[in-house]
A protein has these predicted regions:
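Periplasmic N-terminal accessory/gating domains of Gram-negative outer-membrane beta-barrel systems
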Residues: 1-5, 15, 39, 78-89
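A beta-strand signature from Gram-negative outer-membrane beta-barrel systems
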Residues: 1-32, 91-93, 106, 112-117
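Short, surface-exposed loop/turn motifs at beta-strand boundaries within globular domains
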Residues: 12, 89-91, 127, 210-212
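Membrane-embedded beta-strands of outer-membrane beta-barrel proteins
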Residues: 17, 96, 130-132, 215-217
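Surface-exposed loop/interface segments of Gram-negative outer-membrane beta-barrel transport/assembly proteins
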Residues: 25-78, 118-123, 129, 133-214, ...
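Outer-membrane beta-barrel channels and translocator barrels
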Residues: 26, 91, 102-103, 139, ...
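Outer-membrane beta-barrel initiation region
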Residues: 45-47, 84-88, 98-102
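An active-site-proximal structural segment forming one wall of the substrate-binding cleft
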Residues: 219, 227
Length: 258
């Protein structure tokens, strides 16, 4: 129903599978605990030319355009930027629930925690969920109850791989002497950063915290033999908060030393 789907936000636009825990029988209380974890990786990277091949092809382009060749003095790296930004990600999902029932009352309480570490370094996502439902049987044919689903989500500060497949391999990742990430050569540094600047130094520059809650209260009345009347009041609440800042970044330029 919409109140259960609401906590998934846009992720639930194409539908979700909701697993309903079996309710306890009258006089029973059930406790269910389950957890899972896994790993994820990028199985196939985009094949890129190495530094020597890049220098040859770039200078060939300049010659064909009638321009002088680029002086690669000081640019001695041979970096595969995809190797630098990617990592093996980690996923875990954990849930605990308690359900119980008597002749006049049934309840369900569940909580969950999900955490995902992305395939790009410093990319992570987490979600805490809470589900509560209660139903009271006032008479043999009249029941009242409520349901609530809530979630606190810390979305990932997502990064793209575009820079990693565009950046020249001739730049080294880091200059140990000055303790700085290396900038890209003149023909690229105005267009993009060293990919690790975006992945590492700009990590967590966007901080978001989202809350979602939905619920309903209802009353059900069975009358005659095959008829039921149900009245329901529903609510849906969402709060999305985000902050972004631009850090001051220093980088090392191999072509401007001294």
């Amino acid at each position: 129903d919409p109140s259960s789907l609401a906590i998934f936000g846009v992720r639930g636009a194409n539908g979700v599978i909701i697993i309903t825990t079996k309710k306890a029988k009258v006089g029973q209380t059930r406790v269910n605990i389950n957890g899972s974890f896994g790993f994820k990786s990028v199985p196939n990277q985009i094949e890129m030319v190495d530094a020597a091949g890049f220098k040859e092809l770039y200078n060939e382009q300049l010659r064909n355009e009638g321009n002088p060749e680029f002086d690669f003095t000081g640019w001695n790296g041979n970096t595969n930027w995809q190797d630098e930004i990617f990592q093996t990600g980690f996923i875990t999902n954990n849930n605990v629930s308690i359900t119980g029932a008597s002749e006049k009352h049934s309840f369900y309480l569940g909580a969950g925690y999900a955490y995902e570490q992305g395939n790009i370094k410093n990319e992570k996502y987490s979600k805490i969920t809470l589900s509560v439902s209660n139903e009271y049987k006032l008479t043999d044919n009249f029941r009242v109850g409520f349901q609530f689903n809530g979630a606190r989500i810390l979305p990932a500060d997502t990064k793209t791989v575009t820079t990693a497949v565009r950046a020249t391999p001739v730049a080294t990742v880091f200059n140990d002497q000055y303790g700085l990430y290396t900038t890209l050569p003149e023909f690229q540094k105005a267009q993009m950063n060293n990919p690790m600047v975006d992945v590492d130094l700009k990590a967590n520059t966007t901080r978001a915290e989202n809350y979602r809650g939905s619920g309903n209260v209802y009353a059900e009345w069975d009358f005659l033999k095959h008829f039921q009347f149900k009245a329901m009041f529903s609510m849906d609440y969402a709060s999305n908060n985000s902050r972004k800042f631009t850090p001051i970044i220093q980088v090392y330029d191999a072509s401007a030393e001294g």
